[in-house]
Amino acid sequence: KIGYGKLRFSLGKMKNQSIPKEIKALLDTISWTEGTISREANGYDILVGYTSNNSRKIESWNENYPKGHQDHNWYYPRADSTAAGRYQFLGNTWKEVSQTYLNESNANFNKENQDYLAYKRLKWRLSNKGISEQYILDTLSDKEKFVKVSNALAPEWASFPFIDNNGMQRSYYGGQNARDFEDVY
């Protein structure tokens, strides 16, 4: 089991903000659920549908990548998607968070911006459900609390499990595959 409390903390400096280690671990967990964490470049250069048998990567990507999100609709067996990067940002989402938090319409798709904007998006998703950052810090040892966190993040990251009122888990978006909650927690 991977569990968000067990992951290595691979995030670097984020826009001069101090990110609690539990939040860094949660961002690593998101990357793991999206299937990008163990890839070359730690997933920052991955396009939706990447496997070891194909080369769906952002051409010429590096940590200081000077271009924005490509916002190209890539064919993926289950659906077309614009998802890219470590956190599989959709093109429209990237532009929205770029404008909101960086005051740019399509910020550079580099490592620092991907980490920072994923952190901001995570906080936004959680706050919409009344979940504070402190609540996250308290969930490492409380599985029931983490269900609330998982359900809040599932609409943003389809690979995150959504647990319904009957305890059944699924992807928030019916046709996609979500990771098993026991593996995520």
Residue spans for each PLM region:
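Cell-wall polysaccharide-cleaving catalytic domain and substrate-binding groove, primarily
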Residues: I2-A107, Y116-Y185
